[in-house]
């Protein structure tokens, strides 16, 4: 429904929007964007629409630090990969931790606590 912009009733659309706004769903989506595969059995010939959920903050992966934090907010390990957000630099223990955060920064409580 959401990914293809399919028309549904107002109550059904409200149900979809509630799911798209749910932080747990958004974390799952972020990880899928980073490491997930497109599963062909879910594909349709219809044109897809842009992400219809809440707009995530724009962040970008950068090659070097230093970062404001020395330990990854998720694992507690030393940082090796970096992200820029709002002119600030944050570090992560690996590219996956950085990239899932880049996809939707504020849905990750451990990262949001750094801001």
Per-region residue spans from a language model:
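Short cysteine-rich clusters marking metal-coordination/redox-active sites
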Residues: 72-74, 83-85
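Short metal-binding segments enriched for Cys and/or His
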Residues: 97-114
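Residues immediately within or flanking Cys/His clusters that coordinate Zn2+
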Residues: 69, 87-90
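A conserved hydrophobic position in a structured secondary element of the catalytic/binding core
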Residues: 20, 92-93, 103
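Cys/His-rich microdomains that often coordinate metals
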Residues: 78-79, 101
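C-terminal alpha-helical interaction module
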Residues: 1-68, 83, 99
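Cys/His/Pro-rich metal-binding microdomains
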Residues: 73, 91, 95
